[in-house]
Amino acid sequence: MRAFLTFTLFWIWTSSAFAQVFLNVQDFGGFPNDGASDDAALQSAFEEAAKQNAQGVFLPAGRWQFEKPIYVPRGLTLKGTYTRPHIAERADLEGAGTTIECYVGRAADIDKEPWKYESCVTLLGSATLDGVNLVYPEQADVWNPVPYSWTVFCNNDYDENHQVREISRCAVVNTTLVNSYAGIFMRWSANDHFISGVNMSVFKKGMVLDGITSLGVIQNVNIHNQYSWPFYGIKASDHAKAELLAKQNLENMTGIEFHRADWGWLNQVFIIYANKGFVFEKSMTAADSSQWEFGTRALPSFDISNSGCDLCNVAVEANFVNTGVGVNFSNSNLLGRVILGDSCYGSLRFTNAFFSFGVTGADVEKDQFTVGKHATLQIVNSEVLNFPEGISKEAPWRGKVFNVRGVLQLSNTVFAVPDTGRYDARTFEHLIVQGSGLATVQNVIFRGPEFRFSTKEKGRVRASMIGHREISEEMPYNPPR
């Protein structure tokens, strides 16, 4: 009995506390599901919340229509009903939970100075977006998407002398982006950004980070077109439509781009059907494109764990990476090519990773791993599977598993090529080292063909403790059916 009373009193207290710290937009004239603009009501609620030092503004369940950009003020939260991200079922889009309908940012050029365009939601200093769906009602044709600006935008506030007046430190949690053209952009959002529990379906780009510094966290993020299916009336049984949408994403969509960044952590991030999954580049800002301000600190450096890219054309592309810390992947599944460009002077390290390759017939001439002349690729305690299912036996694969012009360090790893009928046996090689490249291969087991490699120019290979096990009916790679 005492335990029951304690629980009851706690529930009453927390409910009362919530009512005090969050102002309800309905008390300011906002009404869901009526087809009318709720911009003025939300603005009034934010102004009053700031006066009362409240925690933020609460949007109850329903469809809320915003025809102007939403600016969440410094230190406040725009809160909906959801306590976790979800697949946006039709009932959710019809008002079972909090759904924000976005009408701003149409026909924006997100690849050139994207910060000049209005976003659906802009988070100011230490502001949070929590527990909502975001949907574009006018993005009606899934096969011909219209460009829109970023759905969620985080940016520092500057004065007239371009000095930082307010650091963003934005947070997006428990939120679903249903049919965004471009998802979340963090530009000069400084320390401590926090993205957690976000599902998104995007047509062009999922997330971009540019000009951030230490200690940002991104976790539990899924980028998958299935979150748009209910909006467009696509069912799981509609295999033809699902495959067509996946093909469209494979041609056009990028998962996450990392530009100027000092340090950050990613955990449990999943990307599927992307042309490019994880991309590492220099800053998008022209004044900072030389990366001179903080030297190599201006280039991306991240620790990425328990994450993956499934059925992507390019799983990882690194053209600029921090030459000190670099980028570290651990416990990752990466189904797609890995490219380290010639402009990459840093290193990518993979520990306990699984790699696979081959999505479309367009890959027949492409290499699974490319290491540019200044780059370093390290793979430890991993498995490399070469099983290009999308490549026919009539047009076999003619690329290399590793094409190295920089440095490759490969150890304690298994190579598997289970279907030798899908590559050209006359040209197949696990490794080619060119230019002044160097590859060390140690404690590696090859399943399928024995270790094949070649060198050109000044390329060198150092191999030791190499094992081989054939693949046959008696020793299959996959269990028998």
PLM regions: where:
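Leucine-rich solenoid repeat scaffolds
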Residues: L431-R481
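Right-handed parallel beta-helix
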Residues: T128-L250
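Short glycine/acidic-rich loop motifs that flank beta-strands on beta-rich extracellular proteins
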Residues: A54-Q55, E67-P69, I87-R90, E138-P145, ...
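Feature marks extracellular polysaccharide-active and adherence modules
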Residues: P60, E67, P73, K79-T81, ...
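Positively charged n-region of N-terminal signal peptides that target proteins for export
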Residues: M1-F4
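Extracellular beta-strand-rich solenoid/capping regions of secreted or surface-exposed proteins
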Residues: Q43-K51, W64-K79, R84-G131, V135-S168, ...
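Acidic Gly/Asp/Thr-rich repetitive segments characteristic of extracellular carbohydrate-active
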Residues: V25-P60, Y71
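N-terminal signal peptide c-region/cleavage motif recognized by signal peptidases
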Residues: T14-S15
